[in-house]
Amino acid sequence: MMTTPELSCDVLIIGSGAAGLSLALRLAEKHKVIVLSKGPVSEGSTFYAQGGIAAVFDETDSIASHVEDTLIAGAGICDRHAVEFVASNARTCVQWLIDQGVLFDTHVQPNGKESYHLTREGGHSHRRILHAADATGKEVETTLVSRAQNHPNIQVLERSNAVDLIISDKMGLPGPRRVVGAWIWNRNKEWVETCHAKSVVLATGGASKVYQYTTNPDISSGDGIAMAWRAGCRVANLEFNQFHPTALYHPQARNFLLTEALRGEGAYLKRPDGSRFMPDVDERGELAPRDIVARAIDHEMKQLGADCMFLDISHKPDDFVRQHFPMIYAKLLDLGMDLTKEPIPVVPAAHYTCGGVVVDDYGRTDVDGLYAIGEVSYTGLHGANRMASNSLLECLVYGWSAAMDIDRRMPSVHSVDALPAWDESRVENADERVVIQHNWHELRLLMWDYVGIVRTTKRLERALRRITMLQQEIDEYYANFRVSNNLLELRNLVQVAELIVRCAMMRKESRGLHFTLDYPQQLAESGPSILSPLTPHINR
């Protein structure tokens, strides 16, 4: 058994987006924190978030209204307590973000007072979205990254992937099962390191990379969900994958999102002949929840045999469009399209994982000392469909609550002196990496075709059979060859793909983001789809 380089901290945070960094900054006043980032520290879904953060700042709005809008969007299976918990703590947590230096757009009211410019997005009954033009995530992420990198108690490790969690019972330690650290793949040095930690937090984001078309960056491979499942944690509602209705249809920008706020400010969805179709689908038109809009676009494309639909805001004044959407306007100009003059081609794409690792109000999972916050988690906030701009808010609120719980418990947690080293004595360098590439493409294509916007029981059964075969191939490959970034992500993706399909097969109805032709109606009563591991997987 080889000797493994070792790291040590009070709290290991796996992920460097809004959830991970807000938690790190709250904890670092009293505790030593390590933050893992799979790529450059700012490369994650937070950085690319365009819309904004939902919170009640307008005196005509109310927390009760925010709660009701979220419950309606969630199609009847949100956890009301979780929704009220998030909405009631929203303003305080957004104010904390402002105190860190995040600059949201402001405007001068008719009475001469300056206030935050609030926009409205799908599902919201009021203007309550704080934003920084059309690049809110970039403003949030760069501010938090700067604060974290300059904090003496925070060590940010870039190009570092968590391989797996280290759990106490695998080491023969007495007492409740708890996390004691993790193995980390250092891509810079191409070796596996062992990290001792009193608490470990999964802030790894979602799993939209499991689909062929996604708005997410390449790192969204479901790592935290897969690691938590292997450690023995329950997962829930993974059948609810949000497909953003309006990803740009262009070969040079396949991951580029056209924010919900465009429709909030009056953009229309049109067929290739220029006619609108959303007013015939829903009384809210283009401001209907995302699942309804995405399904409508998918239906129109299939019915017409069209490659895309079109998003048109050219009827608004040019200056208005350029002022409110400067980043999108500039990006489209680079691609030869003028947002102020012409309709823009759009298609739905996998955007957000509404389910995840089951947690409580403090982000606690089923394993002591292991937390999950942000998109990786299932809090009950989103139900069967996430309402726009509640995702960054969820990151902030659970970053705050998890920090309180970790800080409260820290004095009673004792670190483990010796952790098992990573064993590479029986593996060799990969022989044919084409195996990984082939399985990668096959998995993402079958998930898109069989487990996409519209599903059937037969499609799900086909998907599960093929996923099971892929798992066997990938597990064999993982057992015999040294780890690599692509292998780690593929192993996690195929695990999450299985969980998505199993959750989808449990739900004998159509609800929110899960639509199946075999059960097109919504049941009168329903709840979350919860999967429990029979036995935790054995770490290598």
From Swiss-Prot:
InterPro entries: FAD-dep_OxRdtase_2_FAD-bd, FAD/NAD-bd_sf, Fum_R/Succ_DH_flav-like_C_sf, Fum_Rdtase/Succ_DH_flav-like_C, NadB, Succ_DH/fumarate_Rdtase_cat_sf
Note accompanying the cofactor annotation: Binds 1 FAD per subunit.
Subcellular location: Cytoplasm
Pathway: Cofactor biosynthesis; NAD(+) biosynthesis; iminoaspartate from L-aspartate (oxidase route): step 1/1
NCBIfam families noted in UniProt: nadB (TIGR00551), PRK09077.1 (NF006567)
Function summary: Catalyzes the oxidation of L-aspartate to iminoaspartate, the first step in the de novo biosynthesis of NAD(+).
Official protein name in the record: L-aspartate oxidase
